[in-house]
Amino acid sequence: MKWKEQAIILGARQYGETSVILEVVTRQHGRYMGVVKGGRSRRMAALLQPGNFVEAEWWARLDEHLGLFKLEALDLCASRLMFLPEALYGLQLMASHFRLLPERDPHPILYDILHLFMQNFDEQFVNAELLVRFEMRLLEELGFGLDLSHCAVTGRQEKLYYVSPKSGRAVCEEVGLPWKNKLLLLPKFLIERTNRPVDFDDIRNGFTLTDFFLTRHVWEPRGIKQPSVRAILIQLFERRFHTKA
């Protein structure tokens, strides 16, 4: 078995005295593990950092084997991430989210969002929105997607303002107003295309929305906690948005 594709490095761990097991994600093959021989050497250290873009060639005698990686550097951007905590923590968060999905299962839209994030990692305000969209898509890929296309009560597509925590469906403002304390707020950027800059209220509401459904459908049923980096990242975004304002 053999394939070759552009990949983003998610992580690596020691394997034996001289090698590492590398974890990457690709568009067509999903999240993959493989051995990099000599990966613990100083020469390889810079190449194997999370966030780097590489041309990855994987091969194994049988598909179920761990396999070996041969890598070629494309963009060693990991060193630049160290100076941008939002980008570094964002990468760590998305890597944790990818691990909720089966290994070797392709999820091209999630990969595309990560790829866009890494190409614009110095644009914190863009990336805050991308992370919310990533978590929304993650819910969909796991089978728990939300329906934000129309109001669950009236069927209208206008003035959508809330999301029902019971059904995961949108609710228009006038219908939801009497029960607003029991409903989740719907960020406008998830349903409207606009040139208006996204503000932190929308970002916070987006993370609150995905937090609720990820906790209910994913983290609690699996007996795991949400990644600790997530709360840190939201605080960093809040600080950046307020600084900008």
Curated annotation (Swiss-Prot):
Task performed by this protein: Involved in DNA repair and RecF pathway recombination.
HAMAP family to which the protein is assigned, alphabetical: RecO
Gene field: recO
Gene3D superfamilies assigned: Nucleic acid-binding proteins, Recombination protein O, C-terminal domain
Gene Ontology biological process terms, A to Z: DNA recombination; double-strand break repair
InterPro entries according to UniProt: ARFGAP/RecO (IPR037278), DNA_rep/recomb_RecO_N (IPR022572), NA-bd_OB-fold (IPR012340), RecO (IPR003717), RecO_C (IPR042242)
GO CC terms of this entry: bacterial nucleoid
Alphabetized UniProt keyword annotations: DNA damage, DNA recombination, DNA repair
Entry keyword DNA-binding: no
Protein family according to the UniProt entry: Belongs to the RecO family.
Protein name (database record): DNA repair protein RecO
Superkingdom of source: Bacteria
